[in-house]
A protein has these predicted regions:
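Conserved coupling segment at the C-terminus of the helicase ATP-binding
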Residues: 1-166
Length: 166
């Protein structure tokens, strides 16, 4: 289109682009929401239970190390996430304003972001799992954002990069 992109802090562009094109999910909210929805909406709780089990499997991949990574994308979680999206959408539409709604909505948007990011997964990505004392993170990590950045910039006529640091 007829756009000119002005990109400030260009010296941080690689890190910012990696972050923009990566996505992560945490195990802890899955378990907390599962408990919250156990009685209120069992279908959502069941869906979250399957996601929680998947995250336990991923956690075990790290062994004694705090992290693990692989080139292959975690395709087995995608059907579980899609099921969660379907189970949640109807409930979210009919329960606005409730305390549970806000908590589920936040996780729902994280899942949507994760699934959108998964569409870009190729040889420039890795699957990264990190364990902390009380949580497990699953991340689709974009190692090389240059292709996606280039595609985004091509949507405009020009791009001007600024950096006071360079």
């Amino acid at each position: 289109g007829d756009y000119t992109f002005l990109i400030d802090e260009a010296h941080n562009l690689v890190d910012r682009a990696r972050s923009m094109f990566s996505a992560e999910l945490y195990k802890k909210p899955m378990l907390e929401l599962k408990k919250l929805f156990k009685d209120e909406e069992p279908r959502i709780a069941k869906s979250l239970g399957k996601l929680n089990s998947f995250m336990i499997t991923m956690r075990k991949l790290t062994g004694a190390e705090p992290y693990y990574h692989q080139a292959n994308e975690p395709k087995d979680i995608y059907p579980l996430l899609n099921k969660f999206i379907l189970e949640s959408e109807e409930w979210l539409a009919s329960h606005e304003g409730s305390e549970s709604h806000e908590k589920l909505l936040e996780f729902y948007f994280n899942v949507l972001t994760f699934m959108r990011t998964a569409e870009f997964y190729d040889e420039r990505y890795i699957t990264y799992v990190e364990n902390s004392k009380d949580d497990t993170k699953l991340k689709l990590f974009c190692l090389d954002p240059s292709h996606l950045l280039s595609e985004a910039i091509k949507r405009g006529k020009a791009a001007i990069f600024f950096s006071a640091t360079l």
